[in-house]
From Swiss-Prot:
Residues 709-733 have a biased composition (Basic and acidic residues). Transmembrane segments: none annotated. Residues 441-458, 580-593 have a biased composition (Low complexity). This is DNA-binding protein SATB2. Belongs to the CUT homeobox family. The keyword Glycosyltransferase does not apply. High expression in adult brain, moderate expression in fetal brain, and weak expression in adult liver, kidney, and spinal cord and in select brain regions, including amygdala, corpus callosum, caudate nucleus, and hippocampus. Interacts with ATF4 and RUNX2; resulting in enhanced DNA binding and transactivation by these transcription factors. Interacts with PIAS1. InterPro entries: CUT_dom, CUTL, HD, Homeodomain-like_sf, Lambda_DNA-bd_dom_sf, SATB1/SATB2, SATB_CUTL_sf, SATB_ULD_sf. Sumoylated by PIAS1. Sumoylation promotes nuclear localization, but represses transcription factor activity. Residues 350-437, 473-560, 615-674 bind DNA.
């Protein structure tokens, strides 16, 4: 009661914070955590001006008042404690509550469920989510000038577990913490198959790289799925515990079936004395079943035929449990193995210990870098032979360098695989590198050999090849190349000048995917030789940009013609029915795998049939593309930025003005009809949209500031290019 009576002084009068009594300090168990995080323990005994001196550095003091919600109908709040917390200036403003609670010593689960309310002086308090909509706003951007009059009220929920939290209260932070907990039990690919989030979104949320927070609808959907998942998991554990009782040593013949339970319920009401009379000897015979069965559920003496049936059923249950456990522990690698775009590399089987028993060295990352330098192999080759993954994943692992002792399950599996590979003799590793190089140079041979070695595989092997031509620059030492942050602007200017897509430029300039280039231009990290992966990739792009302009244009034209001729060849050879299926399969091209140019046959001479086939309409959106666009609306919203439109255009192989018109039409239906336009199992042609079905400029201004200007510029640019676009340029976009 004493603490509650003093709490209004702290909540309503920021000028009296320095005079808060010592009773307001945090619990003793949290003091060490506070000192470790730099919380000014003596700041309460000094005037506010003393705290302001710390703002010159990298931290900002934030006064936090933590309140515990008991969940009752009266919503009676109990203040736990009030304390200053030093928060880094570069922390995202949306993560302020979570960062402050972690600094105060609270758990990740409590921090994820908390809600923040900010109070500025004597103004009315405002929820933290109402302050700004910018996902990249930092604490310094919002509190740099007003930190001395700001009070951050943090309300803790009474739910001790995430599954007890209502689905309506799930947010981006709770989803991230739940994903981190689930990734300790399974890898990302397995989790993506079960939960309503894609694998790329899971990775982005966990690594805090998702450029926009997940929508509230998606968070609530994930919360409902998480509650069901935990409930099913608890029921599964209970069934396994109950199945342990079904062994012959515990006399399973006395377990009644459902019909007997129903009849016992009736007889228990009619003749309770007779039921008690029969239950006494049975209790003495099966003491192990006493905790889980009440006397009213125990059966009378069973017939010999029923006893034999229940013994046979117990045998069957025990066999099923034994087989399932044996399969779960026999081939753990085979269950989690993913071949990506490659067939597995045949290796000699050696009696080596399994990955689970291999201790990962703390300097595994330096060992990998030393091995790359010693063997003079690329990250792509090492990632392929060491743990059968892509170069992008290896680059991320080496860039983050997470501690193996606290790594997630999926990362630990990859680290153990790399450690296993590095434990091989040096001669053996060099032989594997050579085999991989030969396989990359001769993809057809490797595909035939892998298909013959694994005839049971129903998946068609696809070899990821890097095209070693004279046009593509080869990776060499970039010590004598001067690279600055201006290279990102040069890349964008080059794509705009040559009118090429990100996918085409990434392919010819660095032999990378469109997604990789999109992330590169989005983050624009400062080039430094210390970041070896980024530096080598930028050196490769710099060498390409240093080529004369006419040579670069020739490379663009050859790559575009090669891609176009390959697609047209397959379209001509197929009968009319599977043509639409082919277009759906190629709407998401394999960005990192394309056949070598020198093996591509020349396009066949035009025939009457091929000339009769018209190129597909550039205003039509297929069913598969509709699904991707609707998923984007569900996850991000109806207002994609320029980067998102460019990404969708390259991914769906559609012009930008087609995608822009689709979003304008959807916003029109949401504004005037209150819901999205439904497409009943048919493709959409945006050319059929009427002018009145698109939002006008004034309506755009009311809904989203500045959106119509960007859409207008993009639409005019695409319409100007559309009239003179060649078939090759159409396909490359």
């Amino acid at each position: 009661m004493e603490r509650r009576s003093e709490s209004p002084c702290l909540r309503d009068s920021p000028d009296r914070r320095s005079g808060s009594p010592d009773v307001k300090g945090p619990p003793p168990v949290k003091v060490a955590r506070l000192e470790q995080n730099g919380s000014p323990m003596g700041a309460r005994g000094r005037p506010n001006g003393a705290v302001a001196k710390a703002v010159g550095g990298l931290m900002i003091p934030v006064f936090c008042v933590v309140e515990q919600l008991d969940g009752s109908l009266e919503y009676d709040n109990r203040e736990e404690h009030a304390e200053f917390v030093l928060v880094r200036k570069d922390v995202l403003f949306s993560q302020l509550v979570e960062t402050a609670l972690l600094a105060l010593g609270y758990s990740h689960s409590s921090a994820a469920q908390a809600q923040g309310i900010i109070k500025l002086g004597r103004w009315n308090p405002l929820p933290l989510s109402y302050v700004t909509d910018a996902p990249d706003a930092t604490v310094a951007d919002m509190l740099q000038d007003v930190y001395h009059v700001v009070t951050l009220k943090i309300q803790l929920q009474s739910c001790s577990k995430l599954e007890d939290l209502p689905a309506e209260q799930w947010n981006h932070a709770t989803v991230r913490n739940a994903l981190k907990e689930l990734l300790k039990e399974m890898n990302q690919s397995t989790l993506a198959k079960e939960c309503p989030l894609s694998q790329s979104m899971i990775s982005s949320i966990v690594n805090s790289t998702y450029y926009a927070n997940v929508s509230a609808t998606k968070c609530q959907e994930f919360g409902r799925w998480y509650k069901k998942y935990k409930k099913i998991k608890v029921e599964r554990v209970e069934r396994e515990n109950l199945s342990d009782y079904c062994v012959l040593g515990q006399r399973p013949m006395h377990l009644p079936n459902m019909n007997q339970l129903a009849s016992l319920g009736k007889t228990n009401e009619q003749s309770p004395h007779s039921q008690i009379h029969h239950s006494t000897p049975i209790r003495n015979q099966v003491p192990a079943l006493q905790p889980i069965m009440s006397p009213g559920l125990l059966s009378p003496q069973l017939s010999p035929q029923l006893v034999r049936q229940q013994i046979a059923m117990a045998h069957l249950i025990n066999q099923q449990i034994a087989v399932s456990r044996l399969l779960a522990h026999q081939h753990p690698q085979a269950i989690n193995q993913q071949f990506l775009n490659h067939p597995p590399i045949p290796r000699a089987v050696k009696p080596e210990p399994t990955n689970s028993s291999v201790e990962v060295s703390p300097d595994i990352y330096q060992q990998v870098r030393d091995e790359l330098k010693r063997a003079s192999v690329s990250q792509a080759v090492f990632a392929r032979v060491a743990f059968n993954r892509t170069q992008g994943l290896l680059s991320e692992i080496l860039r983050k360098e997470e501690d193996p002792r606290t790594a997630s399950q999926s990362l630990l599996v990859n680290l153990r695989a790399m450690q296993n590979f590095l434990n091989l003799p040096e001669v053996e590793r060099d032989r594997i590198y050579q085999d991989e190089r030969e396989r990359s140079m001769n993809p057809n041979v490797s595909m035939v050999s892998s298909a013959s070695s694994s005839p049971s595989s129903s998946r068609t092997p696809q070899a990821k090849t890097s095209t070693p031509t004279t046009d593509l620059p080869i990776k060499v030492d970039g010590a004598n190349i001067n690279i600055t942050a201006a290279i990102y602007d040069e890349i964008q200017q080059e794509m705009k000048r040559a009118k090429v897509s990100q996918a085409l430029f990434a392919k010819v300039a660095a032999n990378k995917s469109q997604g990789w280039l999109c992330e590169l231009l989005r983050w624009k990290e400062n080039p430094s030789p210390e970041n070896r992966t980024l530096w080598e990739n930028l050196c490769t792009i710099r060498r390409f940009l240093n080529l004369p302009q006419h040579e670069r244009d020739v490379i663009y034209e050859e790559e575009s013609r090669h891609h176009h001729s390959e697609r047209m060849q397959h379209v001509v050879q197929l009968p009319p029915e599977p043509v639409q299926v082919l277009h759906r399969q190629q709407s998401q091209p394999a960005k990192e795998s394309s056949p070598p140019r020198e093996e591509a046959p020349p396009p066949p001479p035009p025939t009457e049939d091929s000339c009769a086939k018209k190129p597909r309409s550039r205003t039509k959106i297929s069913l598969e593309a509709l699904g991707i666009l609707q998923s984007f609306i569900h996850d991000v919203g109806l207002y994609p930025d320029q980067e998102a439109i460019h990404t969708l255009s390259a991914q769906l192989d559609l012009p930008k003005h087609t995608i822009i018109k689709f979003f304008q039409n959807q916003r029109y239906h949401v504004k005037h009809h209150g819901k999205l336009k439904e497409h009943l199992g048919s493709a959409v042609d945006v050319a059929e949209y009427k002018d009145e079905e698109l939002l006008t400029e004034s309506e755009e201004n009311d809904s989203e500031e500045g959106s119509e200007e960007m859409y207008k510029v993009e639409a005019e640019e695409e319409n100007a290019d559309k009239s003179k676009a060649a078939p090759a340029e159409i396909d490359q976009r």
